[in-house]
Amino acid sequence: MWRRKHPRTSGGTRGVLSGNRGVEYGSGRGHLGTFEGRWRKLPKMPEAVGTDPSTSRKMAELEEVTLDGKPLQALRVTDLKAALEQRGLAKSGQKSALVKRLKGALMLENLQKHSTPHAAFQPNSQIGEEMSQNSFIKQYLEKQQELLRQRLEREAREAAELEEASAESEDEMIHPEGVASLLPPDFQSSLERPELELSRHSPRKSSSISEEKGDSDDEKPRKGERRSSRVRQARAAKLSEGSQPAEEEEDQETPSRNLRVRADRNLKTEEEEEEEEEEEEDDEEEEGDDEGQKSREAPILKEFKEEGEEIPRVKPEEMMDERPKTRSQEQEVLERGGRFTRSQEEARKSHLARQQQEKEMKTTSPLEEEEREIKSSQGLKEKSKSPSPPRLTEDRKKASLVALPEQTASEEETPPPLLTKEASSPPPHPQLHSEEEIEPMEGPAPAVLIQLSPPNTDADTRELLVSQHTVQLVGGLSPLSSPSDTKAESPAEKVPEESVLPLVQKSTLADYSAQKDLEPESDRSAQPLPLKIEELALAKGITEECLKQPSLEQKEGRRASHTLLPSHRLKQSADSSSSRSSSSSSSSSRSRSRSPDSSGSRSHSPLRSKQRDVAQARTHANPRGRPKMGSRSTSESRSRSRSRSRSASSNSRKSLSPGVSRDSSTSYTETKDPSSGQEVATPPVPQLQVCEPKERTSTSSSSVQARRLSQPESAEKHVTQRLQPERGSPKKCEAEEAEPPAATQPQTSETQTSHLPESERIHHTVEEKEEVTMDTSENRPENDVPEPPMPIADQVSNDDRPEGSVEDEEKKESSLPKSFKRKISVVSATKGVPAGNSDTEGGQPGRKRRWGASTATTQKKPSISITTESLKSLIPDIKPLAGQEAVVDLHADDSRISEDETERNGDDGTHDKGLKICRTVTQVVPAEGQENGQREEEEEEKEPEAEPPVPPQVSVEVALPPPAEHEVKKVTLGDTLTRRSISQQKSGVSITIDDPVRTAQVPSPPRGKISNIVHISNLVRPFTLGQLKELLGRTGTLVEEAFWIDKIKSHCFVTYSTVEEAVATRTALHGVKWPQSNPKFLCADYAEQDELDYHRGLLVDRPSETKTEEQGIPRPLHPPPPPPVQPPQHPRAEQREQERAVREQWAEREREMERRERTRSEREWDRDKVREGPRSRSRSRDRRRKERAKSKEKKSEKKEKAQEEPPAKLLDDLFRKTKAAPCIYWLPLTDSQIVQKEAERAERAKEREKRRKEQEEEEQKEREKEAERERNRQLEREKRREHSRERDRERERERERDRGDRDRDRERDRERGRERDRRDTKRHSRSRSRSTPVRDRGGRR
């Protein structure tokens, strides 16, 4: 196929070379390691691997494909299905179908293994060379190419249709990482993993590889998704894969998976398992991302179609032809020693990148920018990566989308694009280097590099350039690597590298010890390749940084476009917003795929770091074309590699730990980190925000990794820091310096972990680098190559950066060791002197907050401005000081930290420095190691405290240039640390104690009168008396008899032989944290003898002062510590107390004897409860104590008597001692006693009778009285009733009267009425009688 279908992966050639290593690399899994193992196994591949006898032999063997050494026919159906599932292939069908399917996949994998990266870009041509015997594969590849072309055309059409929709959706996805941080870990990892796929540039192979591992876990769901994503990837990747149906792609992926599976099985390291998990997650996420990418790719494909049609996605064969040419050319260049060519190619690439960037910048429309970038990057990548056109096309489009911001950032940042391209390519190339070292396949390496870089169009272009440049580097390295290639081929080296890779990821989890073990192996393997590893580490650093920086730039471009990107960035962000939406989702997926890559890169990172070192060394060696460009590209590639390593570390964490939020924060941080890189133009606060999430995430991840590889990686990180600051350091430093106040604490942690986003990038780069650097730096101490690059980087950075940025880098460096406190001690143990470098340089990047250490510690360092001079001075210092320099840096940071904590706690930070005890440092490392570890811990704890004094940090920054000051301080601290060293040097007893962590610069003035008795309160367990006394004995000679500590070890009274010792102890211990887990700060104050005597039980009453205080005077803030005894206010009380003291002294001694006897069987906790209980219960402590003292005296007397008795206790003794009345032990009564008792009983009975009678009489009387009362009550009731009856009668009478009156009134009224009626009648009759006679008369008349 094209480079085995992986050509599409920028690791296509790498995929071929690495046998899916590209995929593996893309998947960011241990694939690199897996394929490295394979590559190592593979003999040096001639420029045409196809001609490789082993390849042809293996290809011939493809007919007899074996899985894990077993013929497919011999495998069970379940095994076949599992293998198919791993490869994401269909598991349905008869066994013969399964065997066929798996065979095809394995053959493809073998092809990928053996296809030469530099061979003609056409897989067919390669196959013709490699597999002229295998006509099946030829047909297969031809078919795939045809299908890929058709699909690409189709997808280009679809992409054109979906472009707008996807652009809109991608606009929403503009900050996929930012979003990713908000998304569930799966989504985040999926987002990252698509990027990983892109970065793998074997979208499918990476997915298929990740699917190999992932399918087994999430095979079924992921399969479909992967297949859909693979279909998309295949469409994009079928240009590179030779247009093959999804199954064919799966088959191809299956080979890659088989390769990976085999390599994994060969390596079968935990890393691989972790990587597999990560890949599974990546695959899951890639599937989602692939779908997203498909939509993104659709527009990208559309654009790519527009541009890629111009480059007709450069027919795979043409692209392959171009690539083979490019690769063969690159290989030739590499063989020539490519550095000179590198600079030329870098110039060309920078010109191309600049032209592309200018085009992009000129092109306001995202599509135009994307198209131009895609065209240029596709042209470059298709020429150099034609094997990976499909995904490369998509990747290029996405990368171009991403690269638009990246290029814009790189344009703004200057030639970084070229170097970024180169650098971005170098990460693959470094892998190739490692691969080439493993298998001096220099030619393939460029192709692989190119293929790996596709995720970023700029990265693609850069990878083309870088691949060429890398080819040159590889050429330069190839001579070096060729010998070491053989060594690398040697399983030992394979194991170290591969193991280092897994370990890097695992150590990301915290397998420091494993990494130490592997680091030695890496060192061993690295030692065979010291120069190469370093160079490779440099190349890888550059490459990864370039890759990371493109992704960072993408992210930065996204953020910057969203934040304060310049007009170019804004245009690009506008253009890129759609393209970034696609490309940011894709680039987020890329960067995430990079992060898987970075995990893969981490697995490869040792090699990469070495290659970075090589690239850096070359960058420094070729400062002409590279110093600034190289440094920038290195910083870019490192930032990218950091983002990868961050996302990778986060991915590995995700897969390894539920720290998905870290990943999201990591991916988000990555997004922010790029912003920081591009936010050089953006506001510093965004950087702070960026830095904090990143650095915290990356700090955790990078702290782990950085701790593993912190030493070498620190150097690389410093280079990266310098290089990266070139991009964003001027503004970043300014921004961060401006930011520190606002985000001082957050950034301090970040700055401590990585003073800047750069430092965090550095951390991540360091993670990758550290992984490499564990090998590389181990070699470095020999070669010190990274160190010169660091000065060069510093120079470049100094050119590009303001001094503040340099100081920030110094902070990073100095804080880097802090970041890796634990790592440092680990490194110190494993690496010794190199540990110094990593401590100084890498210690900080991955530094995790120690238990009990303030989080602010890590956050506040960014405020320190590191000047270029200071960086230069620090770097040279670090080089000579290896161990101490780390100490110096740590101490510089420590001083800052202590200052911060001092501001916070108001306590003496210097003491912390001196007092901080590094449990980690328990191992007897050179003073440097101990001091470093201790300082690291101190720093951790001081950092929270020292963080507040960000301004002092600035002064410290100023001091950083003269690290000697910090060294002096730190060394002094180191001395104190050594003095405090975990082993009691005085006693010779190896008591491991933590050095107290100074919280304040200067202890607050004592409350009590200075005396030789020191009262230390706020003690919090866990610690042992021996540890406490060891701590106290550091500053003076304890009077053992006068030492008192309460039962719960919350406070103690220490009596020193002299007041000076007491003063020294208070100065050393006041306001420090000890043990480190103590959430409180120790309060050391002077106490009076009375106070001590009282607590020792010699005084019944508290000192009068204490009493008065208890009565009304507020006691000091430390209630446990009695207020420093002042001369008793009342002489009488004093006398009384003295008498009591004398009495209680004796009583106390007796009590102590009793206690010792009693408490032998008592548990400490119970004893504490028993003794402390009464105090806590009673309100009046004085009363309680007095009573207790008395009761204790009595008890002690009784107990003493009991003690006098023979040990064999008689029943009588036991009985007499019992307080209860045990019936069992009543002795029989004598007759007299019986008589007496009988008489007593009779008397008692009589008395009882009398009492009964009396009681009865009384009761009778009572009853009579009660009856009397009852009678009276009855009478009363009767009387009341009578009264009430009388009243009722009277009322009735009255009512009757009233009724009679009423009746009478009525009668009267009636009578009157009748009378009226009568009168009226009479009147009428009279009037009639009168009138009638008149009539009669008249009538008569």
Swiss-Prot record:
Keywords: Acetylation, Apoptosis, Isopeptide bond, Methylation, mRNA processing, mRNA splicing, Nucleus, Phosphoprotein, RNA-binding, Ubl conjugation. Its main location: nucleus. The modification N6,N6-dimethyllysine is found at residue 654. Phosphorylation on Ser-1180 by SRPK2 up-regulates its stimulatory effect on cyclin A1. Undergoes proteolytic cleavage; the processed form is active, contrary to the uncleaved form. Ubiquitous. The Ser-1180 phosphorylated form (by SRPK2) is highly expressed and phosphorylated in patients with myeloid hematologic malignancies. Residues 662-679, 744-756, 854-865 have a biased composition (Polar residues). One of its GO terms (cellular component) is nuclear speck. Residues 219-228, 291-349, 372-385, 486-497, 514-524, 548-559, 714-735, 757-767, 798-815, 892-915, 1098-1112, 1131-1175, 1194-1216, 1237-1320 have a biased composition (Basic and acidic residues). The modification N6,N6,N6-trimethyllysine is found at residue 654. Changing residue 1093 to A: Abolishes cleavage by CASP3 and chromatin condensation activity. The record marks 1093-1094 as: Cleavage. Residues 1-29, 159-460, 475-530, 548-865, 892-953, 1098-1341 are annotated as: Disordered. Residues 161-171, 270-290, 936-946 have a biased composition (Acidic residues). Residues 72-106 form the SAP domain. The modification Phosphotyrosine is found at residue 512. Residues 1116-1130 have a biased composition (Pro residues). There is a cross-link at residues 305, 315, 375, 532, 732, 861, 879, 970, 1047, 1107 (Glycyl lysine isopeptide (Lys-Gly) (interchain with G-Cter in SUMO2)). Found in a mRNA splicing-dependent exon junction complex (EJC). Component of the heterotrimeric ASAP (apoptosis- and splicing-associated protein) complexes consisting of RNPS1, SAP18 and different isoforms of ACIN1; the association of SAP18 seems to require a preformed RNPS1:ACIN1 complex. Interacts with API5. Interacts with SRPK2 in a phosphorylation-dependent manner. Auxiliary component of the splicing-dependent multiprotein exon junction complex (EJC) deposited at splice junction on mRNAs. The EJC is a dynamic structure consisting of core proteins and several peripheral nuclear and cytoplasmic associated factors that join the complex only transiently either during EJC assembly or during subsequent mRNA metabolism. This is Apoptotic chromatin condensation inducer in the nucleus.
